[in-house]
A protein has these predicted regions:
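Charged catalytic and DNA/RNA-contacting regions of genome-maintenance
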Residues: 2-352, 361, 365-381, 385-477, ...
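C-terminal tails and terminal domains of large nucleic-acid-associated
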Residues: 850-882
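Long, charged, glycine-rich C-terminal linkers/tails
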Residues: 103, 273-282, 478-491, 585-607, ...
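Active-site phosphate-binding and catalytic loops of NTP-dependent enzymes
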Residues: 101, 124-133, 272, 408-414, ...
């Protein structure tokens, strides 16, 4: 930084000493202290003082200085106005807000200081620019209003995507409000969250948002949630009958959340929030409950390691053709249904498209020409759409009748309903085709966007401009003849306009009517009254034409905006058709079958496959497996077997198949019957939560606790290696207690994988438990995982064999075999599959053990010994050793 550039905070600057422009800047900046101000100066957006310091650091821009009226220059940096979106996007991604301050008049016509004002504030949840948004993902802003009503938490929560006009809302009433709110946040994954002060008391929610999301949190004052403020905002947006229009309950809290959201949008967007025309109310019980842990473990939309799409369920099912369809597919995966009738409507539609190969192919071809009209309509409403984008809307309209007709060929109720919702928008197509040229410019100011014949004045001005060139040629020929100067020519530049240029050798032939304007080394430049008159006519026509084209294009945008609801309904229908066709295409390509979905308690899968792994292993054989779960004889499957054998894959595939069925997709199996599950819970894998100061075991127990508190009889629970994060006896005791609690108190369908082979005896004590294991083929000291699940407990843990496969040194493997043989010889009655901790191994190898203790150990039947008796026995041994 130069020595004469002194960083100053805006609040410390002496306003009176500043230049007029910097006074204007400071006045606007003080109204937006929490945003980085992009202040338009000519062809740049400039930033000053602390904003300049922040932006130069975050955007890696050169920091310079600007004379501002103070003894020292103000810190300054800037970005070109035509590429500001790139820089704004980077700031937004880092959690900043950006206020766009625009010149409100033409600087060339301004008298004195150019008028400037904020046209909008860009925040993470209010982005509409296509270059700043992911095509396949919605960008939601969330508003939460929560309070205690008679010692019980109640919450109104809503989500809106202003780039598409979608809005959703629900009322929450729960004893444990934290998990309920987190579940809703997981459904929509907002990039910005507005909260009222009372939410700060729900530490579970604030911790989740801080540690597991990238959302910007905006704390709104209680004044934003006052009844009068709420009613004014809702009335302004939806009319006096807003409560009926939106379907809000009389005593609900959603209106307060939505009113605060509208107030925030008015503050930041200034205009364009008319895009939100309606609100879709839903009940949290309308969708399958999926905790953040479950969503991550099942890798629905992003992988756990790389946070990538490849390797997820979304990646497998995405055969969509449109951006709208991609966003809808993601939403369906994030929100599986629990209403079997709605699920079956989707499945019937997918089946119809699955069976109609030609229709499906033609439909996908037509959809491939459909533009992202959801987001385009928002830019049209904001007035920021380009002529090329509006022409893309027209091009889309060409294919809408075909989309409608192809969907109508399938007679299922859902496809008939969606085909009827597709509006061909023929009037808009006609208007756009009449108004715009076939290949309009990307930028309106380049001119030439309006089609000939659309407006008489435009045609007249163009004739003048085009004819003007002919007039200039005629005038040049006339002057050459009159003056006898053969090399006389008429030219143009932006400084002098049109001029007559004559070389020095013909200076004596120049008539007195020529008025000298510029002297060159090679000659002189002149004007004449006739040339000046022609110049005014031509240049005036060009300026008037640009102004007129701008006005006509604005009128076109307004006319399209008036049809917003029609376009929005069509976009929603097209998106759903795209997803249904995608499901059908995935089913054909991947050999899926239509599942039977009903309200029974059955999960029966024949030859089920993991939808993702089988695609990742293309060219390799994926071994299918059967599953039978219900709420009576097969409530819980206890699965044993070595690591790497495929237990986790098997359990996850069952959860994914159930979820796929409940979003309306065909599934990877030869047959499948899914009784609707209201929630899927998973506890898979081990990981520390260092950010929260929690160990692996604490994380595991916290997740198990949530499952035991929230699972119902209709849930599907996946538990993998419960209790392995602590000592053997502690872990085994906890695992057994969890199994008993699920069977006795919840009764839900459960897959329980464990290394505690002692648990396999529980099938004798608890109804509904069945033992299964992953088949292994052993030859000498080598093993082969067959990946096939078979009934009965595992007969060995194969830990040493797995260690060998993992690449442990041969010396370690040999020593492990020797220790194992010694242990087996010392404890001949022990179960080979029993998992022993290191202390137990040392005890068996200790040659100083008294013979009385050895005798007691040899007489012990470990297989039938309950955990509590084992602890008492150990205590007696310890006393004997003293």
């Amino acid at each position: 930084m130069a020595a004469n550039i002194v960083p100053q905070k805006v609040e410390d600057v002496d306003t009176q000493a500043l230049s007029p422009m910097m006074q204007q800047y400071l006045e606007i900046k003080r109204q937006h202290p929490n945003e980085i101000l992009f202040y338009r100066v000519g062809d740049f957006y400039e930033m000053f003082f602390d904003d300049a310091l922040t932006a130069s650091r975050e955007l890696e821009l050169t920091l310079t200085g600007k004379a501002c009226g103070l003894p020292d220059r103000a810190p300054m940096c800037g970005v070109p106005f035509h590429s500001y979106e790139i820089y704004a996007a980077r700031l937004i991604a880092k959690g900043y807000k950006v206020a766009i301050c625009e010149q409100m008049e033409d600087p060339a016509l301004a008298k004195g200081l150019v008028k400037r004002d904020i046209i909008r504030v860009i925040t993470p949840g209010t982005v509409i620019e296509s270059s700043m948004l992911a095509d396949d993902k919605n960008n939601y802003i969330c508003s939460i209003y929560t309070r205690k009503v008679r010692s019980r938490w109640k919450t109104g929560i809503c989500f809106a995507d202003i780039s598409t006009g979608e809005a959703y809302a629900t009322e929450l009433t729960a004893e444990k409000m934290g998990p309920a709110i987190i579940t809703e946040l997981c459904r929509y994954m907002p990039s910005e969250i507005l909260i009222n002060p009372a939410l700060l008391d729900l530490k579970e929610v604030t911790n989740y948002v801080r540690q597991h999301t990238h959302a910007l949190v905006e704390l709104r004052e209680d004044a934003c949630y006052q009844q009068r403020v709420m009613e004014d905002a809702m009335t302004a947006q939806f009319g006096a009958d807003w409560r009926n229009t939106c379907g809000f309950a009389q005593d609900g809290l959603v209106p307060y959340a939505f009113g605060a959201l509208l107030g925030y949008l008015h503050e930041t967007q200034k205009h364009g929030i008319d895009r939100i025309k309606s609100v879709q109310n839903y009940a949290d019980a309308q969708y399958m409950r999926l905790s953040p842990v479950t969503r991550a473990n099942l890798e629905l939309t992003e992988t756990m390691r790389g946070r990538e799409k490849r390797g997820t369920l979304l990646w497998v099912l995405d055969k969509t053709e449109t951006s709208m369809g991609k966003r809808q597919l993601r939403a369906w995966i994030e929100q599986p249904l629990v209403d079997s009738s709605v699920i079956n409507q989707r499945l019937d539609a997918v089946e119809a498209l699955y069976n109609a190969n030609v229709t499906r192919a033609d439909l996908k071809e037509a959809l491939s020409h459909v533009y992202d009209i959801e987001r385009l309509t928002t830019r049209i409403l904001y007035g920021s759409a380009t002529p090329k984008e509006v022409k893309a809307l027209g091009d889309t309209c060409v294919y809408l009748p075909q989309v409608r007709q192809l969907a109508r060929q399938c007679t299922t109720p859902l496809l008939q309903e969606l085909s009827g919702a597709v509006d061909p928008l023929e009037d808009l197509l006609d208007l756009i085709n009449r108004a715009l040229v076939e290949d309009p410019p990307a930028n309106l100011k380049d001119g030439g966007a309006i089609r000939a014949g659309f407006n008489a004045e435009v045609d007249e001005l163009r004739d003048i401009m085009h004819g003007g060139k002919g007039f200039l040629s005629q005038l040049e020929a006339k002057l050459k003849e009159e003056t006898g100067i053969p090399k006389l020519k008429i030219g143009f530049n932006k400084v002098f306009g049109y001029y007559i240029e004559v070389s020095r050798s013909y200076a004596a032939s120049v008539p007195d009517t020529f008025i000298r304007k510029q002297t060159l080394t090679t000659g002189e430049r002149y004007i004449t009254p006739e040339l000046k008159e022609l110049e005014n006519k031509i240049l005036g026509a060009n300026e008037r034409l640009l102004v007129l084209e701008h006005q006509l294009f604005a009128d076109l945008l307004e006319a399209i905006s008036a049809q917003l609801l029609r376009i929005q309904r069509t976009a929603f229908a097209v998106a759903q058709l795209d997803v249904l066709a995608s499901f059908a295409e995935a089913a054909v390509q991947n050999n899926y079958v239509k599942p039977t979905v009903d309200d029974s308690d059955v999960l029966s899968i024949t030859e089920g496959r993991h939808p993702v792994i089988e695609q990742m292993l293309k060219g390799s054989l994926f071994v299918p497996n059967d599953t039978t779960l219900d709420e009576t004889e097969n409530r819980m499957l206890i699965i044993t077997g070595p690591n790497m054998a495929g237990k986790s894959t098997y359990m996850r595939q069952n959860a994914l198949i159930a979820l796929m069925a409940q979003i309306g997709s065909f599934v990877p199996a030869s047959s499948c019957h899914v009784g609707v599950v209201d929630a899927i819970f998973t506890r898979v894998g081990a990981s520390d939560d260092l950010a929260a100061g929690q160990s692996t075991f604490m994380v595991e127990m916290t997740e198990v606790a949530e499952i035991l508190q929230r699972a119902t009889k209709s849930s599907l629970v996946i538990l993998d290696e419960i209790g392995r994060g602590t000592s053997t006896f502690d872990g085994m005791s906890i695992a057994r207690a969890v199994v008993e609690y699920i069977c006795d108190n919840i009764g839900c369908k459960t897959l329980f994988a464990t290394h505690y082979h002692e648990l396999t005896s529980m099938d004798q004590d608890v109804d509904g438990i069945k033992n299964y294991n992953i088949a292994v083929k052993k030859r000498g000291e080598d093993i082969t995982f067959l990946r096939r699940i078979v009934q009965g407990p595992a007969d060995d843990s194969y830990g040493i064999e797995v260690a060998k496969l993992a690449g442990l040194p041969e010396a370690v493997i040999k020593r492990a075999h020797a220790v194992l043989r010694q242990l087996e010889a010392t404890a001949p009655g022990a179960n080979k599959a029993m998992q022993l901790d290191f202390e137990t191994v040392e005890a068996y190898n200790n040659p100083a053990v008294p013979s009385e203790v050895v005798d007691k150990l040899n007489s012990l039947d470990i297989e039938t010994l309950p955990p509590i008796e084992a602890l008492n026995f150990l205590y007696e041994l310890k006393q004997a050793l003293k």
